[in-house]
Design a protein with these regions (language model features):
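Carboxylate-rich, polar loop motifs that coordinate divalent cations or form catalytic acidic clusters
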Residues: 21-684, 719
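Short, surface-exposed loop/turn motifs with a glycine/proline- and acidic-biased composition
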Residues: 725-757
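Surface-exposed coil/turn segments at beta-strand junctions on protein surfaces, enriched
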Residues: 387, 444, 489, 694, ...
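Short, glycine-anchored, charge-dense loop/turn motifs used at functional sites
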Residues: 710-720, 747
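A short acidic/small-residue loop/turn micro-motif
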Residues: 648, 725-729, 766
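Edge beta-strands of extracellular beta-sandwich domains
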Residues: 759-764
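Bacterial Sec-dependent N-terminal signal peptides
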Residues: 1-27, 450, 493, 768
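Glycine-centered coil/turn sites that cap beta-strands in beta-rich domains
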Residues: 678-711, 729-732
């Protein structure tokens, strides 16, 4: 059992868990989604809730919210079940991978990974939890697992080789509702021996509870029943279909799709209709707490006069992304845009999210399908109009092109009102509209909006500022090819990656004559030759970027390949480079960089370093030339949510690196920002300043030029520290060249550009 203790600062709802004045370099920030609340658990002053598989709590006294995640307290991600025990002040947290956390007193976590690590043929779902004395009984896909909350350990595992839907425990027996009928066992017997379990009924109950000293069972699609504990006969208490049934304090609560049954006791039941969208309902001290899905966490009191639930706390949803979707991300100035879903086997809800001024918002989703007559889904890219920051276009991998203004839907472009083409030769128009496959939205320097159209003749379309269209076709890119990502390099050349039947890279130079394709240079390459003359048959190509030196980096299924001289791409003797990393083992041998990794995302930071995302091995930070690995973050050695990286976007002004994974979004505060073109007095400064005795982080000097030479001296002019900026920023650990902490005093920072033509100075006060 692993124990982790973290003290979390209460965060008010209007402040949110993501709002910080300045992130410390090297720190991680949480951007998980906490929408779609599916379960609630009262715990005294706190109400715990699961939103999109993540845990948050609401404090009834000060209305603050705490968001819990792997980076501040928890051991894992993607929560499937929670249950709270008042006596031991313990929240049991079950993750989808069967990992278990015990959150005690809201500040201590005891991790129980044994169940997750156990090799089993059966699935490891936890279907229900009930409590008796110091024990928690977990109903699983194979039997019953018992936790000792006092000792904070797994006490027993009863392998019954059948699914257990729910358990109930009284002073003498355990009752287990299995997929084959009702089982019982005496608590005084050795229940590890299956012979000590008895099947007492063939009735399959979906839920069990001890309520008013009576065993209650729910039979799916039939109703709730009283069960005689002597002969296990049963009699109906109420009829109907109920999707859940739980006991809280002196209340029994049952619900179906649109109504509730609230028990004051067995003989006093209130039936409430028209309560749609309640995924779970709990109760404590006169207040019902609803998991209202998209409505969030809702607190309600029962009005005995009107026989209804009256809302007293409404729509508690932490400021967070609407969904844990991160298919494509990009920054426009200080605004982060996320296109949620692209080429997936499962359709994703149409999702465009924006993070601006530390607040998350979403573009309109409701009523788009009604207005267009087609489902709104699979948003694959987004582009902001350079002439009007309120106008945006979004592509769908299946439904064409959407236009928005001020986040509101304006127009839908598809095969029957624009040049966009249908991917397959289908004669049924009703099916046509699901095959207008658009991606790669990008503006060029002339404010033309470029996009790719999958598996059609005119695979590139351009929407000009005047509303006219240009449709491009080149013979080497046939209808089996799907161009995906588009970038424009410093020369204005277009580069695009292709996936599907033929993976490769397409390059186009229009020579600034967009509407005259006769003078265009264009080439599609599927097989690259590296610097050693080796033919590389990369079956998959995922991403493409240009770095600050004009070098093109391409992410493939066998590591990155580099185009050091992209201007030679159209030549017959063109070749790519695979970076060779020396082994430094005395053999003079070297290995190709990350050749065993799928490179799914690449981003370039202010220091021209490369952030490399992989499909199964986390994220790397590489030096500008790729020869040095500065960081390698994985889900095992960092708060990274998953090793499956889908997208990366960097705020060039702050250095914050946003990392999209298949389990959601988080960010890392890097030490590199975009460099300045020249030194400006007000822009060059150090923080924190003064540096107080209790500060343990690095001191940052910002506002610098690329590769600024830094010298730090004391008041006597003695050199204390020296180095080179990373992009527009330099960090100092407060130590001298010998590695010792410097004493109190004033320290001067002398900065000069790499050519020695510009210089500037600032100072730092250190107080011990």
């Amino acid at each position: 059992m692993k124990k982790k203790i973290v003290y979390i600062c209460a965060l008010f709802l209007i402040i949110t868990p993501f709002l910080y004045a300045q992130h410390a370099i090297g720190s991680w920030q949480n951007h998980l989604s906490y929408h779609n609340v599916t379960r609630t658990e009262p715990a005294g002053n706190l109400i715990y809730a699961i939103g999109n598989g993540s845990l948050f709590s609401y404090d009834k006294e000060d209305t603050s919210i705490q968001c819990y995640w792997k980076g501040n307290l928890l051991s894992d991600t993607d929560i499937s079940y929670i249950a709270y025990n008042k006596e031991y002040k313990t929240l049991i947290i079950i993750y989808s991978n069967a990992n278990i956390d015990l959150l005690v007193n809201d500040k201590e976590v005891y991790n129980l990974p044994d169940y997750m690590n156990k090799n089993m043929i059966q699935t490891k779902n936890v279907n229900h939890i009930c409590f008796a004395k110091e024990y928690a009984y977990l109903s699983t896909s194979f039997g019953v697992m018992v936790l000792n909350l006092k000792k904070r350990e797994i006490a027993n595992t009863y392998i019954l080789n059948k699914k257990i839907n729910a358990c109930a425990v009284d002073d003498a027996k355990i009752y287990a509702a299995s997929s084959e009928g009702l089982l019982t066992g005496l608590l005084t017997n050795n229940l590890l021996d299956n012979n000590n379990w008895n099947k007492v009924s063939d009735i399959i109950y979906s839920f069990l509870s001890i309520y008013n000293d009576t065993l209650i069972g729910n039979i799916s699609y039939q109703g709730i029943y009283l069960i005689n504990r002597s002969d296990y006969s049963y009699s109906q208490l109420i009829g109907g279909y109920y999707s859940f049934m739980y006991t809280y304090e002196d209340k029994l609560i049952a619900s179906n799709e649109n109504s509730l049954a609230l028990f004051d006791n067995i003989n006093k039941i209130y039936y409430l209709d028209h309560y749609l969208g309640i995924a779970h309902l709990s109760y404590e001290n006169g207040i019902y707490w609803s998991a209202g899905q998209e409505k969030g966490l809702v607190g309600m009191k029962f009005d005995t006069t009107n026989k209804s639930l009256e809302t007293i706390v409404s729509s508690i949803i932490p400021n967070s992304p609407k969904r844990n979707l991160t298919y494509r991300m990009k920054f426009e100035g200080e605004k982060l845009f996320i296109a949620g879903g692209g080429k997936t086997s499962q359709p994703e809800e149409g999702t465009i999210m924006i993070f601006e001024n530390k607040i998350w918002n979403s573009f309109q989703e409701k009523e788009i399908a009604e207005q267009t007559g087609i489902s709104y889904r699979n948003i694959s890219s987004i582009a902001q109009d350079p002439t009007d920051e309120k106008r945006h276009f979004a592509s769908s991998i299946t439904q064409g092109l959407y236009e928005f203004y001020d986040k509101k839907f304006v127009k839908h472009y598809t095969y029957n009102n624009s040049p966009l083409e249908v991917a397959v030769p289908i004669t049924n128009p009703e099916i046509y509209k699901d095959f207008v496959r658009i991606n790669g939205l990008t503006y060029d320097n002339d404010n033309n909006l470029w996009m790719t159209n999958y598996e059609v003749k005119h695979f590139i379309h351009v929407l000009k500022p005047d509303g006219k269209w240009v449709n491009l076709h080149y013979p080497e890119v046939d209808t089996t090819i799907s161009l995906e990502n588009i970038i424009f390099d410093k020369r204005g050349w277009l580069w695009a990656t292709a996936w599907g039947y033929n993976y490769g890279v397409f390059c186009l130079n229009t020579k600034n004559t967009l509407e005259d394709p006769g003078d265009d240079q264009h080439k599609f390459v599927t097989n690259f030759i590296n610097q050693d003359g080796t033919l590389l048959s990369h079956k998959k190509i995922y991403c493409i970027v240009e770095d600050k030196n004009g070098v093109i980096w391409i992410g493939t299924a066998q590591g990155p390949i580099i185009l050091n001289n992209p201007s030679n791409f159209f030549k017959d003797d063109f070749y790519c480079t695979q970076i060779k990393v020396p082994r430094n083992d005395g053999t003079n041998l070297a290995d190709y960089l990350l050749v065993s990794d799928e490179i799914t995302a690449i981003a370039v930071d202010g220091g021209n370093r490369k952030w490399i995302g992989t499909g199964s091995n986390g994220i790397y930070l590489l030096s500008p030339d790729g020869l040095e690995t500065i960081h390698h973050f994985t889900a095992e050695n960092s708060p990274l949510l998953s090793n499956n990286i889908q997208s990366i976007a960097i705020n060039s002004n702050t250095g914050e690196v946003f990392i999209g994974t298949n389990k959601g979004l988080l960010s890392y505060q890097s030490d590199a920002i975009e460099p300045k073109d020249s030194f400006v007095d007000d822009d060059v400064y150090a923080y924190p300043n003064p540096v107080k005795q209790d500060y343990a982080g690095v001191i940052t000097i910002t506002g610098l030029m690329m590769d600024t030479d830094i010298k730090i001296t004391n008041v006597s002019g003695k050199l204390i520290y020296a180095g080179t900026s990373v992009g527009g920023q330099f960090t100092w650990n407060g130590r001298n060249l010998q590695g010792n902490k410097v004493p109190s005093g004033i320290y001067f920072v002398l900065a000069a550009d790499k050519d020695g033509k510009q210089s500037i100075a600032t100072k730092i006060l250190i107080i011990k």
